[in-house]
From Swiss-Prot:
One of its GO terms (cellular component) is cytosol. The keyword Membrane does not apply. The keyword Mitochondrion does not apply. One of its GO terms (molecular function) is DNA binding. SUPFAM superfamilies: YebC-like. Gene3D superfamilies: 1.10.10.200, 3.30.70.980. Keywords: Cytoplasm, DNA-binding, Transcription, Transcription regulation. It holds the Pfam family Transcrip_reg. It is found in: Cytoplasm. Belongs to the TACO1 family. This is Probable transcriptional regulatory protein Rfer_2075. InterPro entries: Integrase-like_N (IPR017856), TACO1_YebC-like_2nd/3rd_dom (IPR048300), TACO1_YebC_N (IPR049083), Transcrip_reg_TACO1-like (IPR002876), Transcrip_reg_TACO1-like_dom3 (IPR026564), YebC-like (IPR029072). One of its GO terms (biological process) is regulation of DNA-templated transcription.
């Protein structure tokens, strides 16, 4: 199945994250904190914490720092209490945007998110205004040049829902949320390492943005990404690579 290109968008975000490793670590630590408090410190029984630890390792966070934050979150050490809040809104051309945050001060966070939307041409919506346009699922992205037939065979045999080849040759594997780890493990066991793998909110109906609209949309997304309390951003805009 063919699809739009996501490769340039992934590389753009990765480049920004590489420039701001300290902020990436902060986000991961918040995720570890919330995951451990919600499901306990045992990686074997807490898949959300397992995924957060994988992200930490991929970001080159030292093992002792990972352990420290798990211990702190699970009650061994005292720490900050975070609240998870999702904001919804519209970007350029009516593009749908979800903004997931973790915060110890929701008054500050909502003000910062609203300001970013307003400053860069978007607007915040009410709860439920755009969330229905996204599906909670597992997503794995493989670089252009990866053996498509092998990815498809292993992915579908291990329970993936779909395998999509994007316009630039990148391969996207989609799974139901509960099947994400099993599919990821099967692909990695077959020697197929994804460039990106995560549980995500995937847009059901993407819209294409080009030219000035694409540039403006990317500026809005970057502004939201730069907010300290923002963990993840999901949107349905297919942004022209020239705007990145």
């Amino acid at each position: 199945m063919a699809g739009h290109s996501k490769w340039a968008n992934i590389q753009h975000r990765k480049g920004r994250q590489d420039e701001k490793r300290g902020k990436v670590w902060t986000r991961i630590i918040r995720e570890i904190t919330v995951a451990a408090r919600a499901g306990g410190a045992d990686l074997g029984t807490n898949p959300r914490l397992r995924l957060a630890v994988e992200r930490a390792k991929a970001a080159n966070m030292p093992a002792d720092r990972i352990k420290y934050n798990i211990d702190k979150a699970s009650g061994t050490l005292e720490g900050v209490q975070y609240e998870e809040i999702r904001y919804e809104g519209y970007g350029i051309g009516g593009a749908a945007i979800l903004v997931d945050t973790m915060t110890d001060n929701k008054v500050r966070t909502v003000a910062e998110v609203r300001h970013a939307f307003a400053k860069f041409g978007g607007n915040m919506g009410a709860e439920g205004s755009v969330a229905f346009q996204f599906k909670h699922c597992g997503q794995l992205i493989f670089a252009p040049g990866t053996n498509e037939d092998k990815v498809m065979e292993v992915a579908l045999e291990s329970g993936a829902e779909d395998v999509i080849t994007d316009d630039d040759g990148a391969i996207e594997v989609l799974t139901a949320y509960p099947d994400f780890e099993a599919v990821k493990n099967a692909l990695e066991a077959a020697g197929l390492k994804p460039e990106a793998a995560d549980v995500t909110m995937r847009a059901e109906n993407p819209i294409e943005l080009t030219g000035d609209d694409a540039v403006r949309m990317q500026k809005l997304l970057d502004a939201l990404e730069d907010l300290d309390d923002v963990q993840e951003i999901y949107h349905n805009a297919e942004i022209d690579a020239e705007a990145l």
